[in-house]
Amino acid sequence: MSSKTAIKDKWKLKKWFTIVAPKTFGEVVLGTTPAFDANQALNRKVETTLYDLTGDYSLVYVHLYFRVIGVEGDRLLTRFAGHELSRDYIRSLVRRKSSKIDAITDVTTKDGYVLRVKGLALTTYRAHRSQKTEIRKIIWNILSTRASETTFDEFVQDIVFGKLSNDIFQQAKKIYPLRKVEVEKTKLLKAPA
C-alpha cells in the first residue's frame, strides 16, 4: 500500500486584490479577485453595469467592461475596455413595421485610442433604403468627428451617458422620424503605447 502524498492547498496561498474603476467613473470598487501576486491579475477583464457605478436603476441595461492595467498596493487599476447594451433591452426596442439601422465604424480619439463603435437607430415606420443610408452616414460622421475632437475619457462619458446618442437623434430625425437612437456597443481596439 502506497503512502499518501501531502497535497498543498494553493487557494490558501492566494491574496485578494480590490479592482477599482478608472478616475472617470469615480474610482468605484468593482470587485475583488484572487491571485498569487498582482502581476498575475494584469489583463483580466471585469464586467459591471452602469447601475452598479452610479446607483441609477434606469441604467441597469448598460454593461461596462474594464481591463486591469496596473497595480497600486493591493488595488488593481483598470481602463475602459468597452460597453454593450443588454440583449433584452435591444429586443424590447425593436418593433414590427419599423426599421432598424446599424452603423459600425472604427474611430480614433484625439489622444490616439482606437475604438470600434456600433450605432443603432430605430425608426417609427418602415424607411426606404436611401433614407437608411443617409441616417447611417449621419451616425458615422457624428461618431468620427466627435471622437477626433475629444479625448478617450470624454468620448467614453459621452457614449455611456447618452449625450452622443442624443446628438445623433437630433441630426438624423431630419431625414426620417426616429423612435430611438443608441450607441449599442463599443470595443477598445488599440491604446497608445
UniProtKB/Swiss-Prot annotation:
GO cellular component terms?
ribonucleoprotein complex; ribosome
Tell me which UniProt keywords the record has, alphabetically: Ribonucleoprotein, Ribosomal protein
Q: Which SMART domains match?
A: Ribosomal_S3Ae
Spell out the molecular function terms from Gene Ontology: structural constituent of ribosome
One GO term (biological process) = translation
Q: Please state the span of the N-terminal signal peptide per the UniProt entry.
A: none
PANTHER family to which the protein is assigned, alphabetical? 40S RIBOSOMAL PROTEIN S3A
Name the protein family.
Belongs to the eukaryotic ribosomal protein eS1 family.
Which HAMAP family does this one have?
Ribosomal_eS1
What this protein is called in its record is Small ribosomal subunit protein eS1
**Species this chain originates from:** Sulfurisphaera tokodaii (strain DSM 16993 / JCM 10545 / NBRC 100140 / 7) (Sulfolobus tokodaii)
